[in-house]
Amino acid sequence: MALDKLLEQEAQSEIERIRAEARDRSQMIVAQAQERAQALIESRQRALETQRQAGIVRARSAADLDLNAARLTASESGMSQVYELVNQQITEITRVPEYRDILGRLIYQAREVITDAEAVEVNPAEAALARELVHDIAVRENPAIQGGVRVVARGGKSGITNTLAGRLERVRGELAPQVSRLLAE
Protein backbone atom coordinates (compact mmCIF):
# COMPACT_ATOMS: atom_id res chain seq x y z
CA MET A 1 0.00 0.00 0.00
CA ALA A 2 2.81 2.30 0.56
CA LEU A 3 3.64 2.05 -3.10
CA ASP A 4 0.08 2.95 -4.02
CA LYS A 5 0.22 5.92 -1.76
CA LEU A 6 3.57 6.94 -3.10
CA LEU A 7 2.35 6.64 -6.69
CA GLU A 8 -0.82 8.47 -5.82
CA GLN A 9 1.16 11.26 -4.16
CA GLU A 10 3.49 11.44 -7.09
CA ALA A 11 0.55 11.58 -9.50
CA GLN A 12 -1.10 14.19 -7.32
CA SER A 13 2.11 16.25 -7.29
CA GLU A 14 2.37 15.95 -11.05
CA ILE A 15 -1.26 17.03 -11.42
CA GLU A 16 -0.66 20.01 -9.11
CA ARG A 17 2.48 20.95 -11.02
CA ILE A 18 0.62 20.74 -14.35
CA ARG A 19 -2.27 22.73 -12.91
CA ALA A 20 0.15 25.37 -11.58
CA GLU A 21 1.88 25.58 -14.96
CA ALA A 22 -1.49 25.80 -16.69
CA ARG A 23 -2.61 28.49 -14.24
CA ASP A 24 0.62 30.45 -14.75
CA ARG A 25 0.39 30.02 -18.51
CA SER A 26 -3.28 31.03 -18.58
CA GLN A 27 -2.52 34.08 -16.41
CA MET A 28 0.30 35.00 -18.78
CA ILE A 29 -1.98 34.54 -21.82
CA VAL A 30 -4.71 36.62 -20.16
CA ALA A 31 -2.19 39.33 -19.21
CA GLN A 32 -0.83 39.44 -22.77
CA ALA A 33 -4.37 39.56 -24.16
CA GLN A 34 -5.23 42.38 -21.76
CA GLU A 35 -2.08 44.27 -22.79
CA ARG A 36 -2.92 43.83 -26.47
CA ALA A 37 -6.52 44.84 -25.84
CA GLN A 38 -5.40 47.91 -23.88
CA ALA A 39 -2.92 48.83 -26.62
CA LEU A 40 -5.65 48.40 -29.23
CA ILE A 41 -8.05 50.53 -27.19
CA GLU A 42 -5.43 53.24 -26.76
CA SER A 43 -4.57 53.10 -30.46
CA ARG A 44 -8.23 53.42 -31.40
CA GLN A 45 -8.69 56.26 -28.93
CA ARG A 46 -5.71 58.10 -30.43
CA ALA A 47 -7.09 57.52 -33.93
CA LEU A 48 -10.51 58.76 -32.86
CA GLU A 49 -8.99 61.80 -31.17
CA THR A 50 -6.96 62.52 -34.30
CA GLN A 51 -10.10 62.22 -36.42
CA ARG A 52 -12.00 64.43 -33.99
CA GLN A 53 -9.25 67.07 -34.09
CA ALA A 54 -9.13 66.87 -37.90
CA GLY A 55 -12.91 67.28 -37.97
CA ILE A 56 -12.66 70.32 -35.73
CA VAL A 57 -9.95 71.80 -37.95
CA ARG A 58 -12.08 71.13 -41.06
CA ALA A 59 -15.13 72.66 -39.40
CA ARG A 60 -13.14 75.72 -38.35
CA SER A 61 -11.66 76.04 -41.83
CA ALA A 62 -15.09 75.73 -43.40
CA ALA A 63 -16.46 78.31 -40.97
CA ASP A 64 -13.54 80.65 -41.73
CA LEU A 65 -14.12 80.20 -45.46
CA ASP A 66 -17.82 80.89 -45.03
CA LEU A 67 -17.06 83.95 -42.92
CA ASN A 68 -14.52 85.25 -45.43
CA ALA A 69 -16.93 84.58 -48.28
CA ALA A 70 -19.64 86.48 -46.42
CA ARG A 71 -17.23 89.33 -45.73
CA LEU A 72 -16.13 89.37 -49.35
CA THR A 73 -19.72 89.37 -50.55
CA ALA A 74 -20.58 92.15 -48.14
CA SER A 75 -17.46 94.04 -49.15
CA GLU A 76 -18.21 93.60 -52.85
CA SER A 77 -21.79 94.66 -52.26
CA GLY A 78 -20.61 97.66 -50.27
CA MET A 79 -18.04 98.50 -52.92
CA SER A 80 -20.68 98.29 -55.64
CA GLN A 81 -22.95 100.56 -53.66
CA VAL A 82 -20.14 103.04 -53.07
CA TYR A 83 -19.20 103.16 -56.76
CA GLU A 84 -22.85 103.39 -57.76
CA LEU A 85 -23.25 106.34 -55.40
CA VAL A 86 -20.07 107.95 -56.75
CA ASN A 87 -21.27 107.50 -60.34
CA GLN A 88 -24.56 109.17 -59.38
CA GLN A 89 -22.58 112.02 -57.86
CA ILE A 90 -20.51 112.29 -61.04
CA THR A 91 -23.72 112.57 -63.06
CA GLU A 92 -25.01 115.25 -60.70
CA ILE A 93 -21.71 117.17 -60.67
CA THR A 94 -22.23 118.09 -64.32
CA ARG A 95 -25.10 120.32 -63.16
CA VAL A 96 -23.17 122.44 -60.65
CA PRO A 97 -21.53 125.75 -61.63
CA GLU A 98 -18.05 124.44 -60.73
CA TYR A 99 -18.36 121.86 -63.51
CA ARG A 100 -17.27 124.54 -65.99
CA ASP A 101 -13.78 124.51 -64.41
CA ILE A 102 -13.75 120.71 -64.23
CA LEU A 103 -14.72 120.33 -67.90
CA GLY A 104 -12.12 122.96 -68.83
CA ARG A 105 -9.40 120.95 -67.07
CA LEU A 106 -10.56 117.69 -68.66
CA ILE A 107 -10.42 119.30 -72.12
CA TYR A 108 -7.02 120.86 -71.43
CA GLN A 109 -5.52 117.57 -70.18
CA ALA A 110 -6.88 115.60 -73.14
CA ARG A 111 -5.58 118.20 -75.61
CA GLU A 112 -2.14 118.03 -74.02
CA VAL A 113 -2.03 114.36 -75.02
CA ILE A 114 -3.61 114.81 -78.47
CA THR A 115 -1.74 117.86 -79.74
CA ASP A 116 -3.17 117.65 -83.27
CA ALA A 117 -6.79 117.56 -82.09
CA GLU A 118 -9.48 118.11 -84.71
CA ALA A 119 -12.56 118.04 -82.51
CA VAL A 120 -13.81 117.82 -78.96
CA GLU A 121 -16.75 115.52 -78.30
CA VAL A 122 -19.00 116.03 -75.29
CA ASN A 123 -22.42 114.97 -74.12
CA PRO A 124 -25.19 117.00 -75.81
CA ALA A 125 -26.13 118.46 -72.41
CA GLU A 126 -22.59 119.87 -72.09
CA ALA A 127 -22.12 121.05 -75.68
CA ALA A 128 -22.95 124.71 -75.03
CA LEU A 129 -20.53 124.82 -72.10
CA ALA A 130 -17.80 123.14 -74.18
CA ARG A 131 -18.31 125.68 -76.99
CA GLU A 132 -17.69 128.45 -74.47
CA LEU A 133 -14.40 126.77 -73.51
CA VAL A 134 -13.13 125.63 -76.94
CA HIS A 135 -12.78 128.15 -79.77
CA ASP A 136 -10.10 126.76 -82.08
CA ILE A 137 -11.56 123.34 -83.00
CA ALA A 138 -15.00 121.85 -83.52
CA VAL A 139 -17.17 120.78 -80.61
CA ARG A 140 -19.32 117.75 -81.43
CA GLU A 141 -22.12 116.16 -79.50
CA ASN A 142 -21.65 112.54 -78.50
CA PRO A 143 -24.31 111.03 -76.21
CA ALA A 144 -21.90 108.23 -75.22
CA ILE A 145 -19.67 110.72 -73.40
CA GLN A 146 -20.83 111.33 -69.83
CA GLY A 147 -19.14 113.77 -67.47
CA GLY A 148 -16.13 114.57 -69.57
CA VAL A 149 -14.68 114.85 -73.03
CA ARG A 150 -13.28 112.90 -75.95
CA VAL A 151 -10.66 114.63 -78.06
CA VAL A 152 -10.23 113.18 -81.56
CA ALA A 153 -7.64 113.58 -84.30
CA ARG A 154 -6.83 112.11 -87.72
CA GLY A 155 -10.42 111.86 -88.79
CA GLY A 156 -11.44 110.02 -85.62
CA LYS A 157 -8.73 107.35 -85.94
CA SER A 158 -6.91 108.73 -82.93
CA GLY A 159 -8.40 110.06 -79.76
CA ILE A 160 -8.52 110.07 -76.01
CA THR A 161 -11.45 110.00 -73.64
CA ASN A 162 -11.08 111.93 -70.40
CA THR A 163 -14.17 111.53 -68.22
CA LEU A 164 -14.72 111.57 -64.49
CA ALA A 165 -16.17 108.05 -64.61
CA GLY A 166 -13.18 106.85 -66.65
CA ARG A 167 -10.78 108.36 -64.14
CA LEU A 168 -12.67 106.69 -61.30
CA GLU A 169 -12.48 103.35 -63.11
CA ARG A 170 -8.72 103.75 -63.63
CA VAL A 171 -8.10 104.26 -59.91
CA ARG A 172 -10.76 101.84 -58.71
CA GLY A 173 -8.23 99.07 -58.09
CA GLU A 174 -6.02 101.42 -56.10
CA LEU A 175 -8.96 102.75 -54.10
CA ALA A 176 -10.53 99.36 -53.41
CA PRO A 177 -8.44 98.53 -50.30
CA GLN A 178 -9.05 101.96 -48.81
CA VAL A 179 -12.79 101.83 -49.51
CA SER A 180 -12.98 98.30 -48.09
CA ARG A 181 -11.17 99.42 -44.96
CA LEU A 182 -13.56 102.36 -44.54
CA LEU A 183 -16.57 100.10 -45.06
CA ALA A 184 -15.26 97.66 -42.46
CA GLU A 185 -15.01 100.38 -39.80
Curated annotation (Swiss-Prot):
Protein's GO biological process: proton motive force-driven plasma membrane ATP synthesis
InterPro entries per UniProt: ATPase_E_C, ATPase_V1_Esu
Alphabetical UniProt keywords: ATP synthesis, Hydrogen ion transport, Ion transport, Transport
Keyword flag Ion transport: yes
Cystines in this chain: none
Record carries keyword Transport: yes
A GO CC term assigned to this protein in UniProt: proton-transporting two-sector ATPase complex, catalytic domain
Coiled coil: none
Molecular functions (GO terms): ATP binding; proton-transporting ATP synthase activity, rotational mechanism; proton-transporting ATPase activity, rotational mechanism
Similarity comment text for this entry: Belongs to the V-ATPase E subunit family.
Protein function: Produces ATP from ADP in the presence of a proton gradient across the membrane.
Name the UniProt record assigns to this protein: V-type proton ATPase subunit E
Gene label: atpE
